[in-house]
Amino acid sequence: MKRFFVLFFLLFSVSILSQIQDNVTWSVEPNPFNDSEKIKITVSGVDPSKWSTQDVYLWTWFFDSNDVEVSSQINWNGEWNNSKESMKMTKNSDGTFSFEFTPTELFQYNGIGKIGVLAKAKNGTGDKKTPDYFFEVGKFDLTVNSPKINPVILDREGSISISVTSTNEVNYYLYKGDEVLFESLNNKNFSKDVLGPDSGSDGLKLIESTTLKLLCEDTSDSNNFMYLSFDIVVEPISIETEPPFELKDGINYDNNNSSKIYLQLNAPKKDFVYVLGNFNDYVKDKKSLMNINPSNNKFWFEISDLNENENYWYQYQVFSKSPVSGSPTVIKVADPFSNLIISSYDDNQIPENSFPNLPKFPENQIGEFTFINKSEKYDWNITEFDKPKKEDLIIYEILVRDFDKESSFQNLIDRIEYFKNLNINAIELMPVMEFEGNESWGYNSSYHLSLDKFYGTQNKLKEFIDLCHQNGIAVILDLALNHVFGRSPLVKMWMDDPDNDSWGGPSNENPYFNQSAKHTYSVGYDFNHQNELTQYYTKRVVEHWINDYKIDGFRWDLTKGFTQNCDENNYDCTNSFQQDRVDLLKSYADYSWSLDPDHYVIFEHLGSNSEEMEWANYRINEGKGIMMWGKMTSMFNQLSMGYNDNSDISRADHKSRGFNDKRLVTYAESHDEERIMYKNLNFQNNP
């Protein structure tokens, strides 16, 4: 695999194709303004013809009064490649473009402290945009001295100081709902201590978590005001109790009660967790607080009274009282062991015919939720498939996105006769687990147990696999488990996020990932496979696809990335024999064979014979042996173009590599290589 070359090309391409228009000027009327006032934003210096269009669209987001970005950028903007028509700016007679709106109405939020804007083409792909610009909200300046983070955890016996400074004389009113808890009049400074429920001091106590709002009203003009919001989470008391039966991480179904499920989350170094979903109206209270299992310190939760024919979803809100520097106090994530998710980022671009009746992402929520679809069952026609022998495999590799115009599993089902006429006996699917965005090769995975909905439903993939098995065709799945991308809950629960924008790489306390990659071919965030939690996660991924989807084999992508012995700049180390990854990957093969004795285990290693022999000859006397990806592109292509130089194909024979049996997957083409026929037509030896 040559993804480092591809990445270089992409970076190079972006620098050439970028169409950012830098020399623009922004203005707003009135100025200054409050968030509840109608405003008119104008930009000058934009030439949409440079983007091959006549129209300009506003893309906007906002920050709360504590300068924390709170927008999902979904509800009003549309998609980056398809802005909503409602965001089109008006072209003025002087060549400027304007847009009028009331911030509180557009964003459906009170207490806006800053608004970010840029102008763009309807399809902003290729950086058809202007740089970011920001407008401060409010007719006077407020400085929040404390708390510096929002939300903030209030210790039960402790206190939090709310301290604010204004440039004007202000009347301050501290609200809980509609109730004024405290007021301070004709002051520039505001200060009030909020006490925990078990505090021994007298004063303003909070018994439960709540949002306090501070109304800051100009003494000379009551129409000139600003709101500050403080989300105060009173430290709850988690109940320590054993679950009714042994749970695995993720969703657990109660075999004796179909209306009940149990959740388990392993979150080391986290203090308490809430489960929020459509079954409890996303309410954070003691009823949504997860229990703690005293025997393993894992969080668990019971959800009951579920209707078999209704869809449900949930999200974890994970809290840390003392996070490492740069890490958030709270983060909202879906379950890392999700089998399906709903996403605020991608779902509105998924075609209805690919995934019918996909639930609409819940309003006023952000991020991703685990989707519980209890009615999604499949009755297999072939329950025990007699796989082709390893040495007889003829594999056809497919990127579902590009196979047919609709980019769906249904396309594959409709072409079964085409596959049969090719006389292949195996199909290898490039990654179909949940990846970031909808247009991808799939190697930017974020949820390895979750199916990406862009290609179709869970049952459609199962139908395709079942149909292949009925026609003697095995199905192999490409698996990228050396890394993950930033939406993964395994990253986000322990991430480095100093700018508090809810995105970042692994922090130094993340139990799953290296902060710096331990090999030279890394993309995304590098798994530490010597950690037991990572090994558990990997085995759960293997188990899921074998047991639930009857996948016949895995092509393990970039197995050079499964070492802890090197660093991201040492090519010699990465490409040399590493005992830790030899042993580790053997253990993963053993686990696969424990679930399916005839499972195909294929490594894309492209390394030295000494290392590949360890795997190819492993348990070969039992009929096992790991199959090695064997690139022969240049040699085969030299022959197909009619050249003698560099046309020796002897290494296509397993014996040339020291393998005791036929465990070499020789190929002339793959997704990483140029098409042979293209070179045949353009560079053939035709004197």
Which residues does each PLM region occupy?
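Aromatic-rich carbohydrate-binding modules that target alpha-glucans
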Residues: D55-Q108, E179-L195, G200, N255, ...
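Conserved structural position at the C-terminal beta-strand
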Residues: A119-A121, C216-D218, V318
